Amino acid sequence: MSDKFQDRTMAFAGICQAAYLVQKVARDGTCDEASLRESLQSVLVTDPKQPLEVFGNHLAIRDGYRALVEQLGSDGSQKNAELTRYVVSLIALERKLAKRKDILNMLGERISQIGRQQQHFDLLDEQILANMASIYSDLISPIGPRIQIAGTPLFLQQPLVQHKVRALLLAGIRACVLWRQLDGSRTQIIFARKKMVELAKRF
């Protein structure tokens, strides 16, 4: 099994983790803080020497590997159609973003600002979350089509929940960038799903 295949599977797990956490926050108003931190931290890794540096280690995206196994596995279990919709939508949105050099330049500048702010604030501070959310709202969401988030209205009305959801969508886009850079494609998911599941189960 090639290193590139392993890296691609890792990138796809990163997308799955962001989608899973979006769903969790939208439904329950909260999610595992460590997983949230790991996904958001990946946004700030803009010049990795190797793919694994984006997430730090495989344990950082364990929820993503678990979601990958559940979604692509052939054990007959009920699939999460909503999570699949988020993953497909994020990949499609990133493909559009990749063609917009003007937006990519602005994206780099805004992410650098957050990196500087992190010297003074914790990554999960509401101010940082709000700034990450605004990057998604200002630069990525308008490219369209907009990703419709389903969840509990009581939670979705709360500003902090909205910030977390949008910040996680930004993290999902970051993982999609890595997936594309590693030549990830829909056909690979279809034809290599069994190998991807076997690999994901190791983590």
Curated annotation (Swiss-Prot):
GO terms for cellular component: cytoplasm; plasma membrane. InterPro entries: HflD, HflD-like_sf. It is found in: Cytoplasm; Cell inner membrane. It is a peripheral membrane protein. The keyword Cell inner membrane applies. Keywords: Cell inner membrane, Cell membrane, Cytoplasm, Membrane. Pfam families: DUF489 (PF04356). Belongs to the HflD family. This is High frequency lysogenization protein HflD homolog. The lineage of its organism: Bacteria, Pseudomonadati, Pseudomonadota, Gammaproteobacteria, Aeromonadales. The gene is hflD.
